[in-house]
């Protein structure tokens, strides 16, 4: 039986070829779904209506200057501050840090 780990200076390491490799291909963001998007400088909430390699087009979009407690905002949909766009906005994918599906009504009232 082949040994799958090695210990060096008291630290146990796993051999790379002993771990199952999973290839992931495709998109994780889908047109027609609502997302909370965090970029390097701003946060947005909106419905994705267009998507290409460089940009995301959001409908019923809002800029979120302050989400409040992050996990509470995602769980309840309650945001500390909301600045709605009149309709759409474009977010550059190059500035994207992360995004989460927004499972609540999109905020459309300034707060």
Model feature map: region roles:
Residues 4-11, 16-111:
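Conserved RNA-binding domains used in RNP assembly and mRNA/RNA metabolism
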């Amino acid at each position: 039986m082949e040994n799958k780990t090695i210990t060096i200076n008291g630290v146990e390491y796993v051999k790379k070829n002993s771990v199952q490799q999973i290839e992931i291909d495709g998109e994780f963001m889908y047109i027609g779904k609502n997302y909370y998007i965090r970029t390097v400088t701003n946060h947005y909430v909106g419905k994705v209506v267009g998507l290409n390699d460089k940009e995301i087009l959001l409908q019923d979009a809002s800029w979120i200057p302050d989400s409040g407690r992050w996990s509470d905002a995602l769980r309840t949909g309650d945001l500390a501050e909301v600045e709605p766009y009149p309709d759409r906005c474009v977010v550059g994918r190059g500035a994207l840090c992360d995004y989460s599906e927004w499972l609540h009504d999109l905020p459309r009232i300034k707060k």
